[in-house]
Regions:
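Alpha-helical transmembrane segments of multi-pass membrane proteins predominantly involved
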Residues: 1-221
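Single conserved hydrophobic/aromatic residue that forms the stacking wall/gate
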Residues: 219-231
């Protein structure tokens, strides 16, 4: 019983983030117009507490080594949480406008869901968990890009993001299938001993890196405004 409890507590970063996400979701559903003015500072305070919770050192591998928690991963998660808190602080004025005031809950929930996916990517000890975390981060991020769906620029950017994410996922999974086929493992710790530098493994690495590059949008794409200027 104690071992199970300690294993669950090793997920304190993810569990605390899920708790903040649920609080933001329920507050958006049930909070009245007068109480919404406390929405922004409350979420920022909860995120600040979550950053401090991430700094608690813990070293443990869960789910057969597929999830790994170390002091280094805790530091990286704290940096990601601090970046998210900075985004929330900078977005206060934008969310306070009349045309975006009603989108506060959606913005917080989608941003926190993206951060949750990044947490799983950081603690991944297996390519499967890494891919699941990548998709958990990409799908809410696509919704964030198209948050202002009635504006042409936002809708087009969301469509581009979804298409590029689909293409990158196909490349990444194709690369992972070659990695597993040539090495027989998807665990990060076991993979270096299985790599032989064959042409097929090099091709698999190229596919994986290409998929990651497309998912990170490491390429240029002209916006509608740029195309109008070029004309």
């Amino acid at each position: 019983m104690n071992s199970n409890l300690s294993a669950i507590l090793s997920l304190h970063a993810e569990l605390s983030l899920v708790l903040i996400l649920l609080v933001a979701l329920l507050a958006d559903l049930f909070a009245g117009p007068l109480r919404r003015r406390w929405f922004h500072p409350a979420v920022c305070v909860l995120m600040a507490l979550q950053i401090g919770l991430n700094l608690t050192p813990d070293t443990r591998a869960l789910f057969g080594g597929m999830y790994v928690n170390t002091p280094f991963t805790s530091i990286v998660k704290s940096i990601l949480s601090a970046g998210t808190l900075l985004i929330f602080l900078q977005s206060g004025e934008w969310l306070g406008r009349k045309d975006t005031h009603y989108k506060q809950g959606e913005f917080y929930v989608l941003t926190l869901a993206t951060l949750l996916g990044m947490f799983f990517m950081v603690s991944a000890g297996h390519f499967l968990i890494f891919y699941i975390g990548l998709e958990m981060a990409s799908i809410p991020m696509a919704c964030l890009v198209a948050l202002d769906k009635y504006r042409h620029h936002s809708a087009e950017a969301g469509a581009k993001f979804i298409l590029s994410t689909m293409f990158s996922s196909a490349l990444l999974l194709y690369g992972l299938s070659f990695i597993y086929g040539t090495s027989g493992t998807l665990y990060f710790a076991d993979l270096p001993a299985m790599l032989q530098g064959s042409a097929l493994q090099q091709f698999a690495l190229v596919l994986f890196l290409a998929g990651m590059g497309f998912n990170c949008l490491l390429y240029t794409s002209p916006s509608p405004r740029d195309r109008q200027k070029s004309r």
